[in-house]
Amino acid sequence: GLEETAFYDPANFTYPAGAYACEVEVDPDTGKVSVERFTAVDDFGNVINPMIVTGQVHGGLAQGIGQALLENCTYDENGQILSGSFMDYAMPRASDLPLYAVDHSCQTPCTHNPLGVKGCGEAGAIGSPPAVVNAVINALHSGGHTHVTHIDMPVSPSRVWAAINS
């Protein structure tokens, strides 16, 4: 039969750059975290279709916020996954997410490809977990809980409450 094998190994890769800011509210009595605002600013080079790029960032932000606050795989002592269905694996709902402020107007063309584009597909999912966790730590510090310097993901209400009361 007909077979074809091809490889693409560019001499230089194309990496986007971005900055993410998250504002959260933390209930110190329960440890519940709610994301109030999220701003994502990225340089994806020349943007061919802004609507698709914005959608990619929105989806990535939802994934990252879910990873930071909710998603957790648990296993038994034999390595069998215990959180393998939507009944016991938490993901964010639309009501858990804020309206995002997304900006990709800074378009520094990439010099390593003819279109001047950079990847945008996973940017939101990469920058958002640390932005959320750092916002939680900052909110706790602002509330007088300066002893809290780290909380493992997911930053669940029980983990936040335990950190506050440690």
Model-identified regions with their sequence ranges:
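C-terminal catalytic domains of large/alpha subunits in multi-subunit enzymes
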Residues: 1-166
